[in-house]
Structure formats: structure tokens, C-alpha cells
Amino acid sequence: MAKQPRAEVTRQVIMDAAVELFDEVGYGETTLTAIIERAETTKGAFYYHFADKEAVAGAIIDEGGVRVEEVTRRITDSSSAGLEKLIRVTFAVADLSTHDRIVRSGYRLRQGLYQISPAGSRSYVERMDHYVKAAHDAVFEGDVCDDIDPGELFELLHTMDLGCHLLSDALSDDLFAHEARAWRMMLRGIVPPDKLPYFQEFVARVARQYAQPE
């Protein structure tokens, strides 16, 4: 039997309450009772949707992954050049993780709690497929050096992205500035010299679109 809209609303309220508490005190310090109280629901309503706190965290990881996948697919399926897609998608996902609390919480939970949901590894594989295709296009188009393996380029981008998020969280500063600096450094190693000025300017232009006000 399909869940009724009212039940879906309750489920979302519980997830939102958990996200707030995970942000405020951390996953480890958040109790099941605190989630139920913050959601202003009952134990019965909670257990209708979730078996325990880990199940809520898993649902947050899942939902965050879905939202990231939607943004990634929209950009990588566009008609833009391959390397432009890769640059745009890193900033778009950074923007999503900055302004969407589910995505931001999902990122943090996934880094420490891979074991509670298959969504972590699944979202990695899904992102890899999109990124590798765009990387193949970038090599074919001559914007990335032809001796660079698209799969290895994805691994580098994924590592760069995780590092930017970790630094931004640790320093409480601008994620987009970290992304821009990382791209400027990485482009020197993957882009032919004659293409470098264009893509350095492209990164700067995209970064300005997402720049946080002073």
C-alpha cells in the first residue's frame, strides 16, 4: 500500500528535525528522544517510518544523494564542452551542499557512516559514470591532455571535492573559494598550455556566479 501524503510529511519532518540536531550537536550526541521531541511527533509515528537513529541517518544520506544526482545529471547531460561541465558541476554541487541542509548533512554523515547506508557507495558510482563521460568528452575535444585517463581524473576530482568540503567545514569559510583555488592549481596539470588561459578565466567566471557576499 502506498504511503499517504500525511505520512510522507511526517517522515520529512522527522528527517528535518534530525538534520537540525546533527548540525547542532553532532550525530553521536543526538538521541532518538531528542529527534522525536524536535519533530513534535510520537514514538509510534517515528517507528512507523524508521527503526532507529541510524535509519534516519541512512534516509538523509539517500535523499541527499538523490538531490546531488539530479543536479549532476542535469549539468553533465547538457551540450556544453566536457571540461566546462566538470567545472560547473563541482560548483553547483558545492552550492547545493551550502544551501540544502539535507545534502550538507548527508555529506557529513556519509564521510563517517558509510556502513549505515549503501547510498554512499551507490552515489559514488553514479557520479563516476557522469564525470567519466564528461572527462572522455574533454579529452576528445582537446581540452584535457590526451594522456590523462578519464577514470583517474574522476578520482582526482572526487578527492579534490571532498578536500574542499572538509577544509571549508574545518575553517568555517567560503567553500567556493576553495573550489576555485583547487581548480586553478589542477588545470595546470591537465589542460594543454594553449587552452589554460581560457579555462582559468572560465573557473573565475563560474566562481563569481556563486561568490558569497562580503
Task: Give names to the regions the model predicted.
Residues 44:
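Key DNA-contact positions within bacterial/archaeal DNA-binding proteins
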Residues 47-50, 54:
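A short His-aromatic
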Residues 91-148, 166:
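Short secondary-structure transition hinges
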Residues 1-25, 29-41, 54-58:
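Basic, helix-initiating cap at the start of DNA-binding domains
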Residues 59, 70-103, 150, 154:
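Hydrophobic alpha-helical connector segments
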Residues 128-129, 133-137, 141, 170-214:
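C-terminal peripheral helix-coil segments that are non-catalytic and often amphipathic
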Residues 13, 84-92, 152-159, 177, ...:
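Amphipathic alpha-helical interaction segments
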